[in-house]
Amino acid sequence: PMIRSKNYNFSYSGLKTAVLYAVNKLKAVNSDNKLTDEQKIMMAYEFEQAAVEVLIKKSAKAITKFKPKTLIIAGGVAANQELGRQAREMIKKDFPEVRLLISTRELSTDNATMIAVAAYLHLQNKTRIPKNFKADGNLSL
């Protein structure tokens, strides 16, 4: 799992796969082959806790090594209230000398805004995409 990796990278593909398997297992034991509302809530809660735990532990590790004056949480993830709560708790308890900045919900946009701006700039520059263009999730802007 990413939480035990020695680097500072985040990846949730393993977590998402684990959730998929857990959901399928739960659905198999339910008579209607669906999750109950309680099971959905439980899965969402556990997913959020696991995702936030990785972010907090990796951030603490980075703060310990690089000694920044400020930790900034921005982008779509900054809208997550649990992440904000745990980040404030971590800074207060373990790194009181570090300033924590969390963008407001209004400014907590995700990659869609960045992609839209990039597309707009390409349009302004009259950049054309070839018709045989293939989607690539790792394509640079």
Residue ranges and their predicted role:
Residues 1-141:
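Acidic, glycine-enriched active-site microenvironments
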